[in-house]
């Protein structure tokens, strides 16, 4: 570039005409510049202005995502609500949805030799219950006796909102509907499981479950899901005199069928001691059978 400029100026340099500074191209500013300045001038970085996305679009996306999340959570909650059709099948589905149901028997292995279960389908006199407790203690010295009353378990569930069957029991009570098959067994099973995880649960224990089972279905479910029954104790006086006072014919027949179910497998024992003068003889016979 500098050579070209000299070539154009050569005729003028050898001519006699006076060359004025105004006729000479002004290249001094270019020649005096440093390479860095030349590069800066020829390679200017042009910053492109970014397009600003509309704020309303982001707000719209956030609202849509929030609604979708709320809808998802609401559906998950609806799936865990209490079933309105409380048949046995529906109750089994309720157990599976809430994570209660277990396919294996609760008491098995080492616990089956440490725990024994005695059921009393119907009892109205607590004095009789105390007598049975004392007989078991004298029969198995050093063995703990644990009494389970399903009616107390139901009240505990009703009073504590944090318990699993709280809302189910209140709905059944409001609708005046009977308890579905398997509900009482589920409560008893839960109580036994809680006991087995305590310090007392590490010792040998005789369980007495009063006023249970009162249907054959509950008896079968207990032996399938919880443990085998050692003896089903039938209080002759209460079954004959007290049962008709507090239960209708259908309920009486269901409880009597429980007696027949355990009697068919040789695990039912009828106790006839109330107002019986031969108490000592009764105790000897009972201890042999237990």
From Swiss-Prot:
- What InterPro entries does this protein map onto? P-loop_NTPase (IPR027417)
Gene3D superfamilies given in the database record? P-loop containing nucleotide triphosphate hydrolases
Q: Which UniProt keywords apply?
A: Membrane, Mitochondrion, Transit peptide, Transmembrane, Transmembrane helix
Q: What is its main location?
A: mitochondrion
State where the protein is found.
Answer: Mitochondrion membrane
What family does the Swiss-Prot or TrEMBL record give for this protein?
Answer: Belongs to the AIM36 family.
Protein name listed in UniProt: Altered inheritance of mitochondria protein 36, mitochondrial
Organism lineage reads as:
Eukaryota, Fungi, Dikarya, Ascomycota, Saccharomycotina
